Swiss-Prot record:
The lineage of its organism: Bacteria, Bacillati, Actinomycetota, Actinomycetes, Micrococcales. It comes from Clavibacter michiganensis subsp. michiganensis (strain NCPPB 382). This is Glycine cleavage system H protein. The keyword Cytoplasm does not apply. InterPro entries: 2-oxoA_DH_lipoyl-BS (IPR003016), Biotin_lipoyl (IPR000089), GCV_H (IPR002930), GCV_H/Fam206 (IPR033753), GCV_H_sub (IPR017453), Single_hybrid_motif (IPR011053). NCBIfam families: gcvH (TIGR00527), PRK01202.1 (NF002270).
Length: 123
């Protein structure tokens, strides 16, 4: 599991872990809990160009369907095929095996710190 305090976050409940010019992206445990049992995940394809703030995928649960937003501009370099095959990883390990995509970026926008995100969700 990733150290959650070292991550950056969006108001749309995604987390971002930066390693050089590649960001690993997932949804937070808060979002996974609100969704309920995740049963389907649709992700962008490797090579897709993402624009920050745009819808890039979908996540379906037994309770609802939610949109996945690109937290940053960039190019998808890897998708987590394990999550596509076993969507429950989003619930069981959202900050680890439940990551969604890796994106190569040129500039990182200002995102929320862990403390700012915790204040946003009130937990």
């Amino acid at each position: 599991m990733t150290d959650q305090t070292s991550l950056q976050y969006t108001a749309e409940h995604e987390w971002v872990q930066v390693d050089g010019d590649v960001a690993t992206v997932g949804i937070t445990a808060y979002a996974a809990d609100k969704l309920g049992d995740v049963v389907f995940v649709e992700l962008p394809a490797v090579g897709d160009e993402l624009a920050g703030g745009e819808v890039v995928g979908e996540i379906e649960s037994t309770k609802s369907v939610g949109e996945l937003f690109a937290p940053i501009d960039g190019t998808v370099t890897e998708v987590n095929d394990d999550v596509v095959a076993s969507p429950d990883l989003v619930n069981s390990d959202p900050f680890g095996a439940g990551w969604l995509v890796k994106v190569r970026f040129e500039a990182l926008p200002t995102l929320l710190s862990h403390d700012e995100y915790v204040a946003l969700v009130g937990e």
